[in-house]
Regions:
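N-terminal amphipathic/hydrophobic interface segments
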Residues: 1-264
Length: 264
């Protein structure tokens, strides 16, 4: 009789936050146990699991998973990993945590506590991360922080794609840059170009002034921005308002198009 092993209840709560994709469901392949110092069975503890201890290593396709101890549910192609958990995909993606439940059939990894995803110069920190190997997206839902070479971005909900290098932030978004702080409701961010796309009510605060906007983009490298939908730029006693504002924070110069007003 087949035994069905589902993710622990604490992991199911995030299912509704999963980002919908148009990708074909992943082809089912086997998870293999590569190494363990000891292997045992205990029907009183986990009747359907191989109990593994010491230098445990699994392989699933091109991904490797390491931990100190694990339960391996071979019948359902899944595993639970404990302590010093590490996932490696190629030589560019590394994910660490204290706990992992991995479903080899769906290729979804549920990592909990002290989770860190490293992808080149981008590092994601959270305590709850669900990582879908197909289509290669990690998402968090209890607060997270993404750090690159220039900015620190945090939010309550978020996701990051190691393939596209794009990050999405929702709810209590904050961007910390050496020259400014951005507060927003919804923000997309390209970790390569360092351009933030603003998609909700936002405030950008710097020594040179304050910007209020709900739509546009901000180039955090060149400190230039395009602000739409009657955005407002405040600098000293001056307030600039317009349908479209191209603003250079370094020079303090702004070009306004449509329904412009300047309060001095």
């Amino acid at each position: 009789q087949d035994v069905t092993v589902a993710p622990p209840d604490s992991l199911k709560a995030a299912d509704s936050l999963q980002v919908m994709t148009d990708t074909v469901p992943p082809k089912k392949t086997k998870v293999y146990l590569i190494h363990s110092n000891t292997l045992s069975f205990d029907k009183a503890v986990k009747p359907d699991a191989q109990i593994l201890n010491g230098d445990v290593c699994f392989r699933h396709d091109s991904s490797y998973m390491y931990c100190d101890s694990a339960y391996f549910f071979e019948q359902t192609n899944s595993l639970e990993a404990f302590s010093n958990v590490r996932m490696e995909q190629g030589d560019t993606l590394f994910v660490y945590g204290d706990y992992l439940f991995y479903d080899g059939n769906t290729q979804v990894a549920y990592l909990r506590e002290n989770v860190r995803m490293e992808n080149g110069q981008v590092t994601l920190f959270t305590d709850s991360l669900n990582y879908e190997r197909i289509p290669n997206i990690g998402y968090y839902f209890e607060g997270g922080l993404i750090v690159d070479s220039l900015n620190q971005l945090s939010s309550f909900y978020g996701q990051y794609s190691p393939e596209t290098k794009l990050a999405v932030f929702n709810d209590s978004v904050q961007v910390e840059n050496p020259d400014f702080t951005l507060y927003s409701d919804t923000l997309h961010y390209d970790t390569e170009s360092k351009v933030a796309t603003i998609l909700g009510p936002s405030v950008i605060v710097s020594d040179s002034g304050t910007i209020h906007t709900s739509r546009g983009w901000y180039d955090t490298v060149n400190n230039t921005s395009l602000l739409l939908d009657q955005s407002q730029v405040e600098s000293g006693e001056k307030i600039l308002i317009g349908d479209s504002i191209f603003y250079n924070r370094d020079t303090g110069m702004g070009e306004v198009y449509g329904n412009m007003s300047l309060i001095d």
